[in-house]
Amino acid sequence: MASGAARYRLSCSLPGHELDVRGLVCCLYPPGAFVSVSRDRTTRLWAPDSPNRGFTEMHCMSGHSNFVSCVCIIPSSDIYPHGLIATGGNDHNICIFSLDSPMPLYILKGHKDTVCSLSSGKFGTLLSGSWDTTAKVWLNDKCMMTLQGHTAAVWAVKILPEQGLMLTGSADKTIKLWKAGRCERTFSGHEDCVRGLAILSETEFLSCANDASIRRWQITGECLGVYYGHTNYIYSISVFPNCRDFVTTAEDRSLRIWKHGECAQTIRLPAQSIWCCCVLDNGDIVVGASDGIIRVFTEADERTASAEEIKAFERELSQATIDSKTGDLGDINAEQLPGREHLNEPGTREGQTRLIRDGERVEAYQWSVSDGRWIKIGDVVGSSGANQQTSGKVLYEGKEFDYVFSIDVNEGGPSYKLPYNVSDDPWLVAYNFLQKNDLNPMFLDQVAKFIIDNTKGQTLGLGNTSFSDPFTGGGRYVPGTSGPSNTVQTADPFTGAGRYMPGSAGMDTTMAGVDPFTGNSAYRSAASKTVNIYFPKKEALTFDQANPTQILGKLKELNGSAPEEKKLTEDDLVLLEKILSLICGNASEKPTAQQLQVLWKAINWPEDIVFPALDILRLSIKHPSVNENFCNEKEGDQFSSHLINLLNPKGKPANQLLALRTFCNCFVSQAGQKLMMSQRESLMSHAIELKSGSNKNIHIALATLTLNYSVCFHKDHNIEGKAQCLSVISTILEVVQDLEATFRLLVALGTLISDDSNAIQLAKSLGVDSQIKKYASVSEPAKVSECCRLILNLL
C-alpha cells in the first residue's frame, strides 16, 4: 500500500464483557450491528450509534452453562425476518436466539465436547465443529448428519451454499471438503492446527493456522499462495466486502490487514490474545481480545476516535508488557540494543518494529506511516544476554529451558524429566510429556496444573483465577499430534455370453405395464404429464427375474470346487432345488428348516464360487418364512454382517451385485424391513463405496436400495434417515451414467421430499436441485425427464 493511502485507526473501544471475547459476527439487524460472545457466558448485540461512530449494547443473551466459544447468524426467514443468532459453547451445546428474548428459542444437543465453530447456509442449515472431532449439519432443530473423518478437534467450519459444499479445518492440520455428507477432498499443507477459514468466492477460500501462516486454496485442491507476517498462532480470519482483501488476528497481540496479498498494516493491541475479528459492511474492523474489550478500527475520518481517545489507547498500549520469550519480537540481546536516539530515524515500512534500550528497560516501538512517528507498543520483559549464564537457562538433552522438572507419577517408581519454557503452552507441554513417556492421559490436568503452579508470574497468557491456554481459553483441550472395479458386460456380467446370468434380465414387478419401473427404455406414461405417477413410491422394489435351471446348473458345477467340508451332498442339492421350485412356482408350501440350513451352508462358500447360492438367497428372501428365518432379531445381525462383507470394493462384482439385490428384496416383509432399518448406517456406508465402479447393474441395485429406504422413511418421517438417503442420492448422481439407475434415484429423491418441508430444505442446501436440472432435458427414456421436472417443481 502506498504511504499516502488511508490507514486504519481506532474508532471506539467497547467494554462490557467480563472475560475474553471469543467470537464476533456481523448482524442482519439492525444494519451495521454485530454480535459478540465471551468466556463470561454471554452473547451481546451491539447496534451502531448514529450518525457516525460508536456502538451501544442493545441486547444481552444468556443460555450457556459454560464459556461461549463461537457465533454465527442464521439468515432471515418468513418466521424470523431478522434472522437468528447461533452460539456454541464449552457446555457442548448450540443455543439459538431471536432478537426479542434474552433466553434461547431452543438448544441443539448432540456434540460430545466443546462446540468451537459455526457457519450457516441456506434454508436454515447450520454447520458446527467441535472438539469431539466431528462436524454436524443441522436443519432447524434437528441434526441431519454427522461429518466424521478428522482425528482431532474441528476448529473451523464454513459452508459454500451455492455448490452445497462444506469445509472443515482441524487440529489434525488438515482441511476437508464435504459434499452431501461425504469427504470429497483433503487439503494438506499447514504444519499446525487449522484455526480459521474464510470464503473468497465459489472456488477459493483462505485458511489460517497455529503455524502462523495463511493459505489461499482452490476448492479443487491447489494451494495458490502462502502468506506470512504473524509471529504466533493465528486465531481468526475475515474477508472484506470486496472478497479479495482480508484481516487476521493472532496470539502476537496484533491485528493485521492484508491487501493485494501483502500485509498492508499491523495494529498492536494491549492484550496478549486477539481471538477474533469481523469486517462490517462499511469496511470497519471489529476485534475481540483476551482483555474482554471489543475494539473497532476504521479508515473513515468521520468514524475515527478523538485525539484524546487515541492518546489514551496509545498510552494503554505503551504500558503493556511484552515477554521476550514469546518470540514475537525476534531474538533479543539487551546489551546490543541502541538507545533512544535510534527513534530519530524514520521507519521503512508500516508496522515495522524497533527495540531500544532506555537504562535497564527495553521498549518496543512500531512505525506508523500515516503519523510519521514511532508509537510505543510496550515494555519488553525477560530480555537478557544470549548466553546460559545471563539467561538463567537449564540445559537438557542439548537444549536450553527455563525449567526442567522431575515428575514422580507413581510412588516408588521412576521420575520423569519435564523441560519447560515460559513461552510454551502448559497444556501442550503436559500432553506431549504424557505421550512421550507413555503415561495415562488422565494425568493431563494434574501435570498442567503442576506446571502452572510452579511457574506462576511467568507463564504467558494465564490469569489468576483460571487456567487458560491460547488454543481455547478453557484449559481443557488436548490438541492432536501430527497427525477396483471391473467393467461388466450387460449380456453376462459374470460367466460369459449364453451362460448363467444372475438377475441379468433386470426388474420385474407384478404390475407390468403400469409401474414405470417395469417398462424398458421405451416406456411412455399414458397419463397427463401434470399427473405424478412416479412418487411417492409406496412399496419396496424387488429383483425377481430368475432362471432356476441355469442357477442350479452353475451351483452343481461349482460344488466340485468347494472345500471338502463345505461341499453339498446330493441330498443337499435336492433340497436347494426344492427351495427354488417352491419360490419360483409361487407354491403355498413353506421351505423347511433343513432346506434353510443347507442354503446358509451354501452362501458361506468361498467368495470365488458363492454367487449362485447368493442368487438362490436373493429369490428366497422374498418368501415370508425365509425372510423371518434370516432377518429375525436373533439371526439378523449375523446374516446382514455376512452380506455386508461381500460389499467390499475389492471383492467380486457378482457377489456385490447379488448382495445388494438380496438387501433390496429383504424389504418385502416386516422382519426384513426392521433389520434393514437397524442396519441402515452400516449398510449404506458400505454400499456407497461401490459407486465408483462402472458396473451399471451395481448402480441400479444401489439406486434401488436407496429407493427402498426412501419408501420406509416416507412412512415414518425419520429426518436423520432421510438426510443419509439424500446424501447417498447426491453422491451417486455425481458418478452414475445409466439412466435406469438415475431414474430410480430421482424416484427416491421425490419420495423423500414429498410432503416434508424439512427434507425439501435439506435437499436444497445440498445443492440437489442444481445437480438434477440436466435430467429435465433427457428425451429417452421420457420417464427420467418427467420425474425430474416434477421434483424441480417441489424444489
UniProtKB/Swiss-Prot annotation:
For this UniProt record, give its keywords in alphabetical order, as a comma-separated list.
Acetylation, Cytoplasm, Developmental protein, Neurogenesis, Nucleus, Phosphoprotein, Repeat, Synapse, WD repeat
Q: Which SMART domains match?
A: WD40
**Keyword Cytoplasm recorded:** yes
* Domain called PFU: residue spans: 366-465
Q: Which GO terms describe its molecular function?
A: phospholipase A2 activator activity; ubiquitin binding
What PROSITE patterns does the database record attribute to this sequence? PFU, PUL, WD_REPEATS_2, WD_REPEATS_REGION
Q: Where in the cell is it found?
A: Nucleus; Cytoplasm; Synapse
InterPro entries noted in UniProt: ARM-like, PFU, PFU_sf, PUL_dom, WD40/YVTN_repeat-like_dom_sf, WD40_repeat_dom_sf, WD40_rpt
Q: Which Gene3D superfamilies match?
A: Leucine-rich Repeat Variant, PFU (PLAA family ubiquitin binding), C-terminal domain, YVTN repeat-like/Quinoprotein amine dehydrogenase
User: Any notes on this protein's domains?
Assistant: The PUL domain is composed of 6 armadillo-like repeats and mediates the interaction with VCP C-terminus. The PFU domain mediates interaction with ubiquitin.
Is Membrane there in the keyword field? no
Question: Which of the residues bear the PTM Phosphoserine?
Answer: 50
Write out the similarity annotation: Belongs to the WD repeat PLAP family.
Q: Which GO terms describe its biological process?
A: cellular response to lipopolysaccharide; inflammatory response; macroautophagy; negative regulation of protein K63-linked ubiquitination; nervous system development; positive regulation of dendrite extension; positive regulation of neuron migration; positive regulation of prostaglandin biosynthetic process
GO terms for cellular component: cytoplasm; extracellular exosome; nucleus; synapse
Where do the ARM repeats lie? Answer: 546-588, 589-620, 621-669, 670-715, 716-755, 756-795
Q: Which gene does this sequence derive from?
A: Plaa
Q: What is this protein called?
A: Phospholipase A-2-activating protein
Q: How does it assemble?
A: Interacts with ubiquitin. Interacts with UBXN6, VCP and YOD1; may form a complex involved in macroautophagy.
Q: At which residues is N6-acetyllysine found?
A: 529
Residue limits of the PUL domain? Answer: 533-794
Q: What does this protein do?
A: Plays a role in protein ubiquitination, sorting and degradation through its association with VCP. Involved in ubiquitin-mediated membrane proteins trafficking to late endosomes in an ESCRT-dependent manner, and hence plays a role in synaptic vesicle recycling. May play a role in macroautophagy, regulating for instance the clearance of damaged lysosomes. Plays a role in cerebellar Purkinje cell development.
Q: In which ranges do the WD repeats occur?
A: 17-56, 63-107, 110-148, 149-188, 190-227, 229-268, 270-307
Domain of life, per UniProt, equals Eukaryota
